[in-house]
Curated annotation (Swiss-Prot):
Its cofactor is pyridoxal 5'-phosphate. One of its GO terms (molecular function) is tryptophanase activity. Homotetramer. Belongs to the beta-eliminating lyase family. This is Tryptophanase. Disulfide bonds: none annotated. The modification N6-acetyllysine is found at residues 5, 115, 156, 450. It comes from Escherichia coli (strain SMS-3-5 / SECEC).
Length: 471
């Protein structure tokens, strides 16, 4: 099979979900009713759902079978210990707190690390800044509601869709150290390493870059949290692109990666393939005080620390999904599916970010140059794509980035991207061809697509519930 141009999906489909077809008139009415926000569409009105890969894909038969082992005890569940054992074996982290999803972990660890920095280093809350290669939207939101400014320090190649670069998700190491010195190390409560970098297009971070980042963090005694939603995809890219690790297994690369952080926070709904679940884990006893504080907050916000908002069966499923998501054949297929979609779009003249791990990212700024950033070209493109073909995608640009919480001004965004997120083991190559054909129609009408303005704008994470209208 090595010499075939395209390998088929490396799985058999056993259960299907019917979807309905709709008319153009129906979809136009639906998107207006949703306030020109695809997040607010009803799923039954969506033909191909590319909004997110978070909990929207298929599960493996081994994961489904594992659910039958679920121990639903309120405390001390066997299923918790099965999950904690998987974490130890895969990541090498000694302490595990399950959460209902990634943001459950964020709402716990962020205030704990801020408090720790304040007590131990005299952090000034009016001056505190956290750094990342690029914060995920909820991580940014939780930081901001805790009064912490966020700063993304990414390399110059990250958002240039005309440039091909192996590790576009990398930290700008000079920018990171310069930023720490500017705000004062004691005012930096944490650094978040996001793997892969979602906002940059699912772009990987090299192990060399993670090592260097961690060295800087240790120099200033700043905790590092690995945002681990797509840890397996990042490991696959390291194997493919970082020569030193080409003969390593995904499991070996993953274990090595997590030496360069103190904690991990994970939305397990991505690479661990579960419909619901998250993790907050601490590497060793050097952060045992943080683990203890986080367990206390978990009781209040998520549930008892040995279930953390998850039923026993869900913890068993996650314990298996962490392994299944690292399967090399599976990862090769998944990355190739994204590459196929990107290649097809670029063949018809639709400029994309280089293919990443979980989605194709269309450069809406180049497709719709007549729409200024403050009228959200990628959001306008998302609405047009839905009207044309019933495809739901998500804006990754100025609309998502939001306003500066101190000044109220729109934050400058490095690129206006539309994310076509591919759920795991859900859509076939035929679906990819349909998406490409839909963009042909969108491109033909691109000059007539209008910008958008708010009719309702929430103050935090506005992209989830805001409503807009055409200008």
């Amino acid at each position: 099979m090595e010499n075939f141009k395209h390998l088929p999906e490396p799985f058999r489909i056993r259960v299907i979900e019917p979807v309905k077809r709709t008319t153009r008139a129906y979809r136009e009415e639906a998107i207006i009713k949703s306030g020109m926000n695809p997040f607010l569409l009803d799923s039954e009105d969506v033909f191909i759902d590319l909004l997110t890969d978070s909990g929207t894909g298929a599960v493996t038969q081994s994961m489904q079978a594992a659910m039958m082992r679920g121990d639903e005890a309120y405390s001390g569940s066997r299923s918790y210990y099965a999950l904690a054992e998987s974490v130890k074996n895969i990541f090498g982290y000694q302490y595990t707190i399950p959460t209902h999803q990634g943001r459950g972990a964020e709402q716990i660890y962020i205030p704990v690390l801020i408090k720790k920095r304040e007590q131990e280093k005299g952090l000034d809350r009016s001056k505190m800044v956290a750094f990342s290669n690029y914060f995920f939207d909820t991580t940014q939101g939780h930081s901001q509601i805790n009064g912490c400014t966020v700063r993304n320090v990414y390399i110059k190649e990250a958002f240039d869709t005309g440039v091909r670069y192996d590790f576009k998700g990398n930290f700008d190491l000079e920018g990171l150290e310069r930023g720490i010195e500017e705000v004062g190390p004691n005012n930096v409560p944490y650094i978040v390493a996001t793997i892969t970098s979602n906002s940059a297009g699912g772009q990987p971070v090299s192990l060399a870059n993670l090592k260097a980042m961690y060295s800087i963090a240790k120099k200033y005694d700043i905790p590092v949290v690995m945002d681990s939603a797509r840890f397996a995809e990042n490991a696959y890219f390291i194997k493919q692109r970082e020569a030193e690790y080409k003969d390593w297994t995904i499991e070996q690369i993953t274990r090595e990666t997590y030496k360069y952080a103190d904690m991990l926070a994970m939305s397990a709904k991505k690479d661990a393939m579960v419909p619901m679940g998250g993790l907050l884990c601490v590497k060793d006893d050097s952060f045992f005080d943080v683990y203890t504080e986080c367990r206390t907050l978990c009781v209040v916000q998520e549930g008892f620390p040995t279930y953390g908002g998850l039923e026993g069966g869900a913890m068993e499923r996650l314990a298996v999904g962490l392994y299944d998501g690292m399967n090399l054949d599976w990862l090769a297929y998944r990355i190739a599916q994204v590459q196929y979609l990107v290649d097809g779009l670029e063949e018809i003249g639709v400029v994309c970010q280089q293919a990443g791990g979980h989605a194709a990212f269309v450069d809406a700024g180049k497709l719709l140059p007549h729409i200024p950033a403050d009228q959200f070209p990628a959001q306008a493109l998302a609405c047009e794509l839905y009207k044309v073909a019933g495809i739901r995608a998500v804006e990754i640009g100025s609309f998502l980035l939001g306003r500066d919480p101190k000044t109220g001004k729109q934050l400058p965004c490095p690129a206006e991207l539309l994310r076509l997120t591919i759920p795991r083991a859900t859509y076939t190559q035929t679906h990819m061809d349909f998406i490409i054909e839909a963009f042909k129609h969108v491109k033909e009408n691109a000059a007539n697509i209008k910008g958008l303005t708010f009719t309702y704008e929430p103050k935090v994470l506005r992209h989830f519930t805001a409503k807009l209208k055409e200008v």
